Curated annotation (Swiss-Prot):
Keywords, in A-Z order: Cytoplasm, Hydrolase, Pyridine nucleotide biosynthesis, Pyridoxal phosphate
Organism, scientific name: Cryptococcus neoformans var. neoformans serotype D (strain JEC21 / ATCC MYA-565) (Filobasidiella neoformans)
Name this polypeptide is given: Kynureninase
Pfam annotation, one family: Aminotran_5
UniProt-recorded Gene Ontology molecular function terms: kynureninase activity; pyridoxal phosphate binding
Cofactor or coenzyme needed: pyridoxal 5'-phosphate
Modified-residue entries (N6-(pyridoxal phosphate)lysine), positions: K258
Cellular-component GO terms for this entry: cytoplasm
Gene3D superfamilies recorded: Aspartate Aminotransferase, domain 1, Type I PLP-dependent aspartate aminotransferase-like (Major domain)
Length: 453
């Protein structure tokens, strides 16, 4: 993209020339009015970082599974007319997921939900001692991660003293006046606490700011001090390149309902590095038993080698099958091509937003209606841009968000003051990016006019 701002004609032309433009036709685009808009027609859906859209083949796959349930019932576990027997429903997904996260197939499991998987892995790999018991986590982490991490030191009250439990969490905070964490500041915290840290827990992409963490620089320091590195990849998988093996990450969890379009509250997954020892601490369930003997109903647990040995219950069919359609589509188009298009889409959104008269600069007068972008510049981000709606102290964000929604732009709000916009490669367009910026400006202009009355 040149330094000149693209015109509407440019945006239409880019869509026409886009080699991936056909993938939009694979998805069902929501109706604006059904989403709270004032007019009928397709919404501009920039909320795939919260819930991805329905793939048309996913609808087909779900209907097929309903038919199997109807006609074959329990025998669908073993004999399946579409060659997806339910007892092996995760197997077609594993190769795709492993490739997507940069891992070996035996290191990946497809099961449960993100926080439950997080608890599962922390139970095995958080093994505090008198000298090494602390967990590093960002202060602004997603609340479920924050709650989960805080709960684990309390489970070790036979090993840890009350004062150790009270001081088990090291919370990373940005510098004063900044919105995101600097890598050098994270490394300093690790150095300053090198003898007491057991686990470093970070997101790959931060849910609120959209920051992509430099894991390749952080991981060596984590292991140098003798700690383990765990990642929350909820906003990373399907959004940015993931290289868990290359980065030497110890364990990770993710969900599939955002960029992988598996549906509301769909199934999660996790990764465990080959060779990572759990010290005999494992929460066992029959789906973690060796698949060759699982249905023998033996009282003796024989874990499946690798990550699948940490599964508990059988794989939910109806929250797994929708995932297959998007994984197959990603394989067809090539994830590297998606990353390149995402760079252009989000870069265009950023450029147009920064050219807006409502983009607030530090030198602008205090109290001005507008927004600032707190998401880092490329390459330290994925598709998401987070806009802080100003002035923050006047809490105008909900009104601006509602105006945007009524005009047909579906983003999402994160209290206290952020609106997140995420143009997703598989179904959003450059023309939509241009219109989205216009809607942001219209919503802010209405707020500005209301203040003058």
């Amino acid at each position: 993209m040149s330094n000149d701002l693209p015109t509407k004609k440019d945006l239409v032309k880019w869509d026409q020339e886009d080699a991936l433009n056909w993938t939009r036709g694979e998805y069902e685009i929501p109706n604006s009015k059904a989403c709270g808009g004032e007019a009928d027609g397709k919404a501009i859906y920039f909320c795939g970082n919260s819930l991805g859209l329905l793939n048309k083949k996913a609808r087909q796959h779900i209907m097929e599974e309903l038919d199997v349930w109807s006609t074959s019932s329990v025998t669908g576990h073993f004999n399946h007319p579409y060659q997806r027997p339910w007892k092996h429903v995760d197997e077609p997904l594993t190769p795709h997921l492993a490739k997507l996260v940069g891992a070996r197939e035996e290191e990946v499991a497809h099961t449960s939900t993100l926080t439950s998987n997080m608890h599962n892995l922390f139970t095995s790999f958080y093994q505090p001692t008198e000298k090494r018991w602390k967990i590093v986590i960002e202060k602004g982490s997603f609340p479920s991660d924050w709650y989960a991490v805080h709960s684990h030191p309390r489970l070790h009250d036979k090993v840890l003293r009350p004062e150790q439990i009270d001081n088990a969490i090291i919370a990373l905070v940005p510098r004063e006046g900044e919105d995101t964490l600097r890598t050098e500041d994270i490394l300093k915290v690790l150095d300053d606490n090198k003898d007491s840290i057991a686990i470093v827990w970070l997101p790959l992409v931060q849910y609120y700011t959209g920051q992509l963490f430099d894991i390749s620089s952080i991981s060596p320091k984590v292991h140098e001090i003798g700690a383990l590195l765990g990642l929350d990849m909820a906003h990373g998988i399907g959004n940015v390149e993931c290289k868990l093996n290359e980065w030497n990450v110890d364990f990770a969890v993710w969900c599939t309902y955002k960029y992988l379009n598996a549906g509301p509250a769909a199934i999660g997954g996790f990764y465990i590095r080959s060779g990572l020892e759990d010290g005999g601490r494992r929460l066992a369930g029959w789906w973690g038993n060796d698949a060759r003997t699982r249905f023998h109903m033996s009282p003796n647990f024989q874990p499946t080698p690798g990550a699948k040995g940490y599964q508990h219950s059988c794989t939910p069919v109806f929250s797994s099958i929708p995932l297959l359609a998007t994984l197959q589509l990603i394989e067809a188009v090539g994830f590297s091509n998606m990353v390149e298009k995402a760079r252009r889409l989000t870069g265009t959104l950023e450029a147009l937003l920064k050219a807006s008269r409502y983009h607030v600069h530090p030198a602008d007068p205090k109290g001005k209606i507008g927004f600032k972008i707190i998401t880092p510049a490329a390459p330290y981000r994925g598709t998401q841009l987070s806009l802080v709606i100003l002035p923050e102290e006047e809490h105008v964000m909900p009104k601006v968000f509602d105006r945007m929604l009524r005009k047909g732009l579906v983003g999402d709000e994160r209290k206290p003051s952020v609106i997140r916009l995420s143009p997703v490669v598989l179904y959003n367009t450059f023309e939509e990016v241009g219109r989205a910026v216009e809607i942001v400006e219209e919503a802010l202009e209405e707020e500005e006019e209301e203040r003058k009355r």
